[in-house]
A protein has these predicted regions:
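Acidic, glycine-rich flexible loop/linker segments
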Residues: 94-161
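Feature captures the catalytic cores and cofactor-binding loops of soluble hydro-lyases/lyases
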Residues: 16-18, 22-120
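Conserved phosphate/anionic-ligand binding catalytic regions in large, soluble enzymes, centered on
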Residues: 10, 58-64, 145-155
Length: 161
């Protein structure tokens, strides 16, 4: 639940540099996640930690490796005022939660202990004793995330094999 905080316009090439895409396995992606702006990220991030960033998170390339790298590191979610649309869609498609909340993204600090209740949209900063209300996911998107991604959701509904 520890926060890693970054600025605006975090590009997909910063999340996972293109030079590391020759091995698209989750473990390989995780080992290089955020290394160009935070060389210690991959070695210090723990399951359940949260990334908070400025607007337009995930801009740049359309590849799904960027949200997959974050998910593979164990990141619980990303909180930002806005996301590049293709990153948003790719994150949902792989079952990785992203939360839009400008005030929380501005006020949460690096190192804070934060929790997010995806069913209600409530973001709680335990360190600061503050809460913010984000819009919860619509039911169909929540279902995709809970299933672990679009393909798993379709399989559960018998639409795909």
């Amino acid at each position: 639940m520890k926060v890693y905080k970054y600025g605006a316009n975090v590009d997909t090439d910063v999340i996972i540099p293109a030079r590391h895409l020759n091995d698209p396995s989750p473990a390989a992606l995780a080992s290089h996640c955020m290394e160009d702006i935070d060389p210690d990220f991959a070695s210090t991030v723990e399951a359940g930690d949260i990334v908070v960033a400025g607007p337009n998170f995930g801009c740049g390339s359309s590849r799904e490796h960027a949200p997959l790298a974050l998910k593979s590191c164990g990141v619980k979610c990303v909180i930002a005022p806005s996301f590049a649309r293709i990153f948003y869609r790719n994150a949902i498609n792989i079952g990785f939660p992203i939360v839009e909340c400008a005030q929380a993204a501005e006020e949460i600090q690096a190192g804070d202990q934060v929790d997010v209740d995806f069913s209600t949209g409530v973001i709680t900063d335990i360190t600061q004793g503050k809460t913010w209300q984000a819009t919860p996911f619509p039911e169909f998107i929540d279902g995709i995330i809970k299933s672990g991604g679009l393909l798993n959701s379709l399989k559960e509904r018998g639409v795909a094999k």
